[in-house]
Amino acid sequence: MKTKIGLLIVMLALLISCQQSSAPSLAFHKKGMIKVTIFYPNGEGKTFDMDYYINKHMPLVQRVYGNALKGLTIDKGIGGGSPDTPAPYMAIGHLYFENVAAYEEGLKKNRETFAADFPKYTNVMPVVQISEVIR
């Protein structure tokens, strides 16, 4: 009986440790990297197809940049800073690169590809900011 309980405890510990290690890590950014943030402003008459953005546009971005793109995250605006106020942005995309040149090289080669894809998911002119990751 003690052997069976001991074996059960070992099996449970292995199962739990496997589940914890299989979770994807979002720690792909580090100090000194470049973060390109794409803001999609909210407002009357503005539209944004989050499904298309997630399932079509961002995979396109990943294919274009390949290994130069170190990671990405997507935010969906759900509210403003005060209760019952709309989000200032419908969506925000964050792209991480080792340096500005890695971002600019892919953009120069594929600017038209990205521009042609914008109308498929939004009628908004995005606002882009390039930042250095500090922490």
Annotated model-derived regions:
Residues 1-26:
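Bacterial Sec-dependent N-terminal signal peptides
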Residues 18-135:
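Macromolecular interaction modules
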